[in-house]
Amino acid sequence: MSAKERVVILVVMLMIGGCAMQRPVPPPSTFEVQPLVKEMWTPKADNLVLVLDASSSMAQDYNDFEKFDIGRRMLARFNKTMPDLSINVELRSFGHSLSYSLQSTIPVYGLSPYSRAGVANALSTIVPAGGPSPMGKSLQAVAVDLQGADGKIAMVVVSDGKDMGNTAMDAARELNTQYGNRLCVYTVLIGDDPAGRTLLSEMSQVTGCGQAITADDVDTGAAMAEFVTTVLLDKADSWIFRDIKFESDKAVLMASSYPTLERIIQILHENPELSVEIQGHTDSTASAVYNIDLSQRRAQTVMKYLHDKGIDAARMTTHGYGEGRPIDTNDTEEGKANNRRVELKPLQ
């Protein structure tokens, strides 16, 4: 064998070896986002804190894929699934390669009004994984971040739970002491480390209202939607639409109402199992008897519009409540305008 042939064989062997060492390309995702319709839900938390483990153990593989990639993907799907809520959100990471940050924990998206695009962008910047595992320090920082926050708090911790020591549980207990029944802790295990599973399970029980799951548990759109609901949402008793306007003292829709009505049609088309009661409401300008009749006629006007747009009449009923269920004062013009409204109540 000539020297040239030996060189060619060596190059081929190195190429084969290099290919064998590469991570497999993930198969096409079967995950389909099932977005939750904002109008059908009310937030049960006023603040959402996402904590992502970016330490060196997360750079290890689980089922042939890097755990850190699995964790980031899980949070990205959570972000895509949750409704566009009026809540504050924080994304804090810990660990980090020195090439990303010299700090062991940082608020990548500081506590501020929720922006789906903002959270997605912040999440995409956290690369690569590396460094120690100071979860305890990260949770202590969260306690400080939340000091000015009002209302309920939901915290989702995404980690493999490895190499955390005792400080992580100590910090979780301190958070519970500081925020009490305002706080619920949810944990998502990446991988299958037994000690990590135990740690995250115990952490989720600190507040008495959390849950421990694995990333594998939310690998479908339906499962992720259920988890987002558990963390953030309560079913809305009714959907209030103040943008459905009528001509004064009439049951004739104003043109400004149509965009909102089209949104209702979209919701009903996307949820074909859903039936609704269309509820009409008025202010207190006229007599109570007159307002009952007016509110009923307005509800029927909305029902006719929806039916003409393809919504089965069997899915809809109407009820006029007149002035009897105000959501604002009738002593001001603004309050009266808020009380002149249509609500849709989901029926089981």
What are these regions (language model features)?
Residues 16-18:
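C-terminal motif of bacterial Sec signal peptides marking the signal peptidase cleavage site
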Residues 25-47, 200-275:
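Periplasmic peptidoglycan-binding/tethering modules of Gram-negative envelope proteins
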Residues 20-22:
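Bacterial signal peptide processing site
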Residues 41, 74, 79-82, 246, ...:
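Periplasmic peptidoglycan-binding/anchoring modules of Gram-negative envelope and division proteins
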Residues 61, 165, 281-348:
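Periplasmic OmpA-like peptidoglycan-binding domain that tethers envelope proteins to the cell wall
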Residues 26-36, 41-159, 163-166, 188-198:
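Von Willebrand factor
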Residues 1-8:
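Bacterial N-terminal signal peptides that target proteins for export
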